[in-house]
Design a protein with these regions (language model features):
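C-terminal and inter-domain tail/linker signature
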Residues: 1-143
Length: 143
């Protein structure tokens, strides 16, 4: 596939997730998918890990949307700089939902082989994300 076709495939992946079309996982993610930075702990490997993380993340952030800010491709790799925006409506990482809108920026790199996303690296602003989902604590300043 060409670099442009690979970029289109990654855009389709995010667009289908935004539509809550989890059937896309069977189409675009092979059983032996390799995620170098899984989004959640204790996930099974491969396609099943992608499915489980998608279900868990959508339970916490059911209206999540991915905004593609920039995209580059070379060879079989596609780099996507994106922003994910969602409302925190379900528990995650042990934190109760706040109902607040959260936003996290990051970079995802996918390796594309024969029309499938076979490998993934991600670097997200997890500090900013955690600051948005953790309850605010105001320190007691009394003497």
């Amino acid at each position: 596939m060409s670099a442009e076709a690979n970029k289109a495939l990654v855009r389709r992946w995010f667009a289908e997730l935004d539509k809550r079309n989890l059937a896309i996982i069977n189409e675009l993610i092979p059983e032996d998918y390799l995620d170098h930075n899984p989004p959640l702990p204790d996930l099974p490997p491969g396609r099943e890990g992608v499915r489980e993380s998608s279900v868990r993340l959508l339970a916490a952030f059911p209206d999540a949307v991915h905004i593609i800010n920039d995209q580059m491709a070379e060879g079989d790799k596609v780099m996507t700089r994106l922003t994910t925006r969602a409302t925190f409506l379900g528990p995650i990482f042990g934190f109760p939902p706040s109902g607040k809108t959260v936003e996290v920026s990051g970079i995802a790199v996918h390796r594309v082989v024969e029309g499938q996303l076979v490998e993934h690296w991600a670097h997200l602003d997890m500090v900013g994300f955690m600051e948005q989902i953790t309850p605010s604590v105001v320190p007691d300043e009394s003497p």
